[in-house]
């Protein structure tokens, strides 16, 4: 395994990037396809560690699927119902939250005996709000080690009914409930306690459910009504749009050191909230052009930003890097859920930004970033977090080199990231 990657100073950014499929959409649509009536042909599926964990789990559950085109096309043979296993199994899901949470819910419908576990970091990521909600709906679940964290044993039994869910930590808990509630015996009312984070990710879920023939009643994200005893119907073919979070690095590179960059696979018609990253770049001064399925960013003088970024939590990490190249102190707010991602991203970003010379103030749910007077060469710890590696690659646009430790962590979502980044990089 490669210990580090040193990126030399890049003098200019220019080119076109064809985005891999969205991770958020890929794992959702794989699960929906497995539970739907009929065969679904998925194209532009993301080929990454996280999708492999989902596919491996579906195979172990008994779902038939066939991969082609370098694992980006997948024919999924749906079973037309929730999963019911005749024998106990264990599923290892690494650090893939988009597999762990929805699969736990899906396996909590019929009577089952399944243990879901992951790597060390997954066992530090809270899951109590989802477990509590499933128990309210009649499911039987047990923590196998620490209370509130995976691994978790589910024995099934979720029937629906009235459920109170804390929405303040992760939208994936709500996504998981929404996706399985139509298959429950009873109607389900989900009432949200607290402020729901990352609402655009819920919009992705609702959009996908609609594509598979299921609609729900959304009362301003305060409550959700889902009719029970429904069935998902395969749409036949489904094209996974490009990953908007992955687009952020290339758009940011153009804003900092363009030239221009065109990202193909997301645009005005995208269902992902992270496309609003381009709006933030525009507010900072970058020049943005939109198409139905592409975004173009051109360099311009960048100014500080002071924004609530709860709606783009993953792409907001890239804004923290862009802020290093802007005039003035930028403040990124309402990002507490960074702390329960692949690593504690607030703490990690704070430490690594200081290494390159930035003045950082870290709050419970915010980050203040003052650009360096001059950039310093640094070895960047990635904390086995793919987004840390991709974000800090942009430091090479500062006129100095940067060394990224454990660069292979990008395989979680974007194995070819560095290859693509170098394609649009120009060197003196």
Swiss-Prot record:
EC code(s) of this entry: 2.5.1.19
GO-annotated cellular components: cytoplasm
Transferase as UniProt keyword: yes
InterPro entries named among the record's database cross-references: Enolpyruvate_Tfrase_dom, Enolpyruvate_Tfrase_sf, EPSP_synthase, EPSP_synthase_CS, RNA3'P_cycl/enolpyr_Trfase_a/b
GO biological process: amino acid biosynthetic process; aromatic amino acid family biosynthetic process; chorismate biosynthetic process
Subcellular location: Cytoplasm
Gene3D superfamilies, alphabetized: Enolpyruvate transferase domain (3.65.10.10)
Physiological role: Catalyzes the transfer of the enolpyruvyl moiety of phosphoenolpyruvate (PEP) to the 5-hydroxyl of shikimate-3-phosphate (S3P) to produce enolpyruvyl shikimate-3-phosphate and inorganic phosphate.
UniProt cross-references to NCBIfam families, sorted A to Z: aroA
Quaternary structure (record): Monomer.
Protein name: 3-phosphoshikimate 1-carboxyvinyltransferase
């Amino acid at each position: 395994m490669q210990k580090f990657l040193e990126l030399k100073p890049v003098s200019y950014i220019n080119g076109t990037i064809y985005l891999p499929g969205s991770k958020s959409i890929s794992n959702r649509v794989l699960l929906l396809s497995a539970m739907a009536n009929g065969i679904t042909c998925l194209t532009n599926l993301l080929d990454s560690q996280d999708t492999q964990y989902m596919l491996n789990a579906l195979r172990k559950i008994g779902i038939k699927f066939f991969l082609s085109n370098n694992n980006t096309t997948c024919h999924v043979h749906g079973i037309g119902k929730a999963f019911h296993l005749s024998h106990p199994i264990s599923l290892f899901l690494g650090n893939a939250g988009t597999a762990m949470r929805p699969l736990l819910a899906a396996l909590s419908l019929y009577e089952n005996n399944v243990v879901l576990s992951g790597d060390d970091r997954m066992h530090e990521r809270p899951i109590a709000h989802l477990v509590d909600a499933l128990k309210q709906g009649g499911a039987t679940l047990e923590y196998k080690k620490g209370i509130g964290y995976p691994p978790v044993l589910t024995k099934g039994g979720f029937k629906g009914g009235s459920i109170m869910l804390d929405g303040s930590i992760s939208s994936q808990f709500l996504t998981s409930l929404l996706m399985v509630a139509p298959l429950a015996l009873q109607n389900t009312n989900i009432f949200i306690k607290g402020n729901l984070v990352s609402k655009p990710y819920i919009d992705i879920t609702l959009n996908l459910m609609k594509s598979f023939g299921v609609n729900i009643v959304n009362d301003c994200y305060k409550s959700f009504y889902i009719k029970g005893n429904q069935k998902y119907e395969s749409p036949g073919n489904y094209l996974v749009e490009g990953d908007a979070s992955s687009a952020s690095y290339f758009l940011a590179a153009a804003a900092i050191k363009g030239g221009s960059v065109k990202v193909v696979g997301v645009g005005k018609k995208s269902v992902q909230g992270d496309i609003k990253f381009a709006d933030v770049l525009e507010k900072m001064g970058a020049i943005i052009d939109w198409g139905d399925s592409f975004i173009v960013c051109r360099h311009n003088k960048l100014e500080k930003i002071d924004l609530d970024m709860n709606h783009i939590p993953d792409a907001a990490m890239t804004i923290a890097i862009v802020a290093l190249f802007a005039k003035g102190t930028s403040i990124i707010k309402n990002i507490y859920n960074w702390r329960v991602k692949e690593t504690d991203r607030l703490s990690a970003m704070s430490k690594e930004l200081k290494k390159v010379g930035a003045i950082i103030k870290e709050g419970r749910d915010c980050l203040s970033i003052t650009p360096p007077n001059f950039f310093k060469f640094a070895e960047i710890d990635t904390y086995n977090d793919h987004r840390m590696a991709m974000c800090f690659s942009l430091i090479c646009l500062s006129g100095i080199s940067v060394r990224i430790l454990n660069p292979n962590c990008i395989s979680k979502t974007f194995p070819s990231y560095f290859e693509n980044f170098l394609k649009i990089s120009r060197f003196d």
